[in-house]
A protein has these predicted regions:
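Compact, charge-rich alpha-helical regulatory domains located at protein termini
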Residues: 69-71
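P-loop NTP-binding module
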Residues: 2-35, 39-65, 75-93, 97-98, ...
Length: 312
């Protein structure tokens, strides 16, 4: 438990990364236990609301043909190949959203289109960061995702990176530190009543970290109220203390930031986090702005993990 002035934020101590902790906020999704040891048939039957008669029909076809349950259901027109793929993903604890259950932003390609080229690009980014920042056997720094200008795709990259890290099974926290134009709560369809700004000003409720529905290992700390003094809040010692505390409680901490054009916030946040990755939009971001941002980190106590050129 970490204290900031007169306010206290409750952070549940992490369990082993393969077993995510219970939800941290009311109304959050349940644990992944519901899918442990469930058969493909059970998952497909629930997904497609199959009646007992339909299930028996599939089982009979399965016995007659020697097909697997999923294959038999597809052959009878009671399920699709995507349904079978989703059921397999559930068995292997690989969370993603099938088409009819997609309730979050279309920007979340790692969740909505996990087998697409765009999702694969985020897995490639994850692999690089696992080697450069999130190395085994150490307390990982928080990773700030920064960009020169609005529209570079910073929130898009931070959100999808957080999803892909959570899909590894480790407890992952996405912090929205963009106290200028916050968007993370919109991307994940979460409440934004209390959050980071309240913690740093000493007036937040205890339960400010929310679990993302359908992704047991992913949690979000939204901005909360947009403050009039965002740069001053992140420059206070409490912000650095909070980042260190969160980094010790979660396997991965990703921090979304304001665009550099708004002020020094993003450079300060990167220094407090300890690591950063820069996002630039291909054929859109200005080279001079990118150079200035990278130069602003020179001499700061931050590891620059690389530059991501966003093509989407």
């Amino acid at each position: 438990m970490a204290k900031f002035k007169d306010s206290t934020i409750e952070i549940v101590d992490p369990t082993p990364s393969s077993r995510p902790a219970p939800p941290l906020s009311a109304g959050a999704a349940g644990s992944e236990d519901a899918t442990v040891d469930r058969s493909i048939g059970d998952i497909i039957a629930e997904l497609r609301n199959l009646t007992a008669e339909q299930v028996e029909k599939v089982l009979k076809h399965q016995r007659d043909t020697g097909l697997r349950f999923g294959e038999a259901a597809v052959a009878l027109g009671l399920a699709s190949k995507d349904d079978v793929l989703y059921a397999l993903a559930q068995q292997f604890h690989y969370p993603y959203a099938p088409e009819e259950q997609r309730k979050l932003s279309a920007d979340l390609v790692a969740l909505n289109e996990p087998f697409s080229p765009r999702a694969e690009s985020f897995r490639a980014l994850r692999s690089q960061l696992m080697m450069r920042v999130f190395t085994e056997g150490t307390v990982h720094p928080a990773l700030a995702v920064i960009s020169p200008e609005p529209g570079d795709g910073k929130t898009y990259c931070a959100s999808n990176l957080a999803v892909t890290l959570a899909q590894l099974g480790g407890r992952t926290l996405l912090v929205d530190a963009d106290m200028r134009v916050p968007r993370v709560h919109e991307v994940f369809n979460l409440k934004n009543g209390a959050g980071l700004s309240g913690i740093l000003s000493g007036r937040a409720d205890k339960q400010v970290i929310q679990q993302v529905a359908g992704i047991p290992s992913l949690f979000v700390l939204p901005v909360g109220t947009v403050p009039p003094n965002p740069q001053e809040l992140v420059e206070r010692p409490a912000f650095g203390l909070l980042m260190r505390e969160l980094a010790s409680k979660f396997d991965h901490v990703i921090v979304d930031t304001p665009a550099a054009v708004y002020g020094a916030d993003c450079a300060v946040i990167a220094a407090r986090c300890g690591a950063a990755v820069v996002v630039a939009r291909k054929d859109a971001s200005r080279a001079e702005s990118l150079r200035e941002l990278v130069a602003s980190l020179a001499g700061a106590p931050v590891k620059l993990a690389g530059v991501v050129f966003n093509e989407f």
